[in-house]
Amino acid sequence: MMEFKVSPLTKIISLSGFLALGFLLVILSCALFHNYYPLFDILIFLLAPIPNTIFNAGNKYHTSDFMSDSSNTGQDLAHFLTGMLVTSGIALPVVFYHCQLIGHLSCIMCMIGGLIIYSSIVIFKWFFKKDFNEDDSLFG
């Protein structure tokens, strides 16, 4: 079976373009409508992966199984905080729209841009989860 391999440099370049698209959507949702409240959404989506990163730093090989008897309160708290921040990042533009602080197009652009920002951070962590010491070099 043929295995599809992508160099780490290609991954970084594609993810940076994906991240730039997310920032562009959020900034355009602010600049086109002369209202800069959606910039708070960038802050929330940038803070969202931090709890999982902090609590999973020393626990690289732990698999989360909800049926196991061992409990890891730190990881549960990290998952809760990350879920709360992602939900807040999605709901904040809706609240701004409901309060008539932003328009509906700005709300849609901000939500899509924020989700792109968060997903690019998660995909980056997923791509580079394995060690760089394997047979991949930086340029191929």
UniProtKB/Swiss-Prot annotation:
Main location: membrane
Pfam families, per the entry: Vps55
Domain of life: Eukaryota
Cytoplasmic side: 1-11, 59-76, 129-140
Membrane-crossing residue ranges in chain numbering: 12-32, 38-58, 77-97, 108-128
Phosphoserine modification, residue list: 137
Disulfide bridges in this chain: none
Cellular compartments per GO CC: endosome; late endosome; Vps55/Vps68 complex
Biological processes per GO annotation: late endosome to vacuole transport via multivesicular body sorting pathway; protein transport
Residues in coiled coil: none
InterPro entries in the record: Vps55/LEPROT
Positions in the Lumenal compartment: 33-37, 98-107
Assigned protein family: Belongs to the OB-RGRP/VPS55 family.
Other observations noted: Present with 2340 molecules/cell in log phase SD medium.
PANTHER family per UniProt: LEPTIN RECEPTOR-RELATED, RH04491P
Protein name: Vacuolar protein sorting-associated protein 55
Protein's organism: Saccharomyces cerevisiae (strain ATCC 204508 / S288c) (Baker's yeast)
